[in-house]
Amino acid sequence: MPKEFEAKFLNIDITSIKNKLRENGATKVHDPLKFYRLIFKRCEEAGDKPGFVRIRDEGKKITMTTKIFNDKKFPEEHEVTINESFEKGCEFLKAIGIQEKSYQETMREKWSHPLAHEITFDIVPGLPIYMEIDCTSEANLNKLVALLDLDKSNMKYGSFDKTYTKYYDIPSDNIIHKTPSLTFKDVGTQIKPNKNVSLFREITKLNKLIDERKMDTYYKKYKTLIYDKFLSETPGSESKTKSKNKRTRRHKKGRRNATHRRKSGI
């Protein structure tokens, strides 16, 4: 059965990575396109393996996909392109009794490379831009990661619900089962971050530019407000910094107490 050998890279310097892609033979397939998708639960008869069914409008085509997570890193995937509209695809799944879960919007810029099925830069409501590399084998994935000199500490697997957990400590279950809609216009009221609140606030402001189709302005402000200001450290660095500061304060307090004891003759 087909597997999807895919990895996400967070905290990316978009300009630098695109330059490396060009230097290593990659070409841009299309500029950012807005994707719309409706997520459905898999049939109960399919068993208890986690997964979903998706209808997605990719701007130039409509796809119907199912992903089955037998493997923590690389899910099993089956996908077909349908000739009917997005709405007709959704009607078909509802007609055969598959339950609708959520509606989601994303923006995607696609690149191609001989080692990859596709390389994408994804903009998801409320999240910093990340890159996804999708290959036909794990060996090709590792080769491309090395070729582009990507930071493996920022390499993540799985669907984007886990990315919300990484940046904002929002449980995956909240995104998968308790968020019926994720849109650029309203994400600020659709989910609530538990950390990195300032980052989330700035991202949601920028997301409104996407909804208004002001992509040039979005990218300029993203570089200044998000990458330079917030993403110099890995997701979760906020808590690491607090921990480091706490250790520093304990160390200084210990030194002061030792000095006091020496002066007091203790």
Tell me the role of every PLM-derived stretch.
Residues 1, 18, 61, 128-130, ...:
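Long, contiguous binding/interaction regions
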Residues 1-116, 153-230, 247-256:
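N-terminal strand-loop-strand beta-hairpin
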Residues 37-38, 68-69, 86, 120-123, ...:
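Generic hydrophobic/packing signal
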Residues 72-74, 137, 261-262:
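Intrinsic-disorder/low-complexity, polar/charged segments
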Residues 96, 102-146:
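Conserved, surface-exposed functional patches that form binding/active-site neighborhoods
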Residues 234-265:
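Arg/Lys-rich, intrinsically disordered low-complexity tails that mediate electrostatic binding
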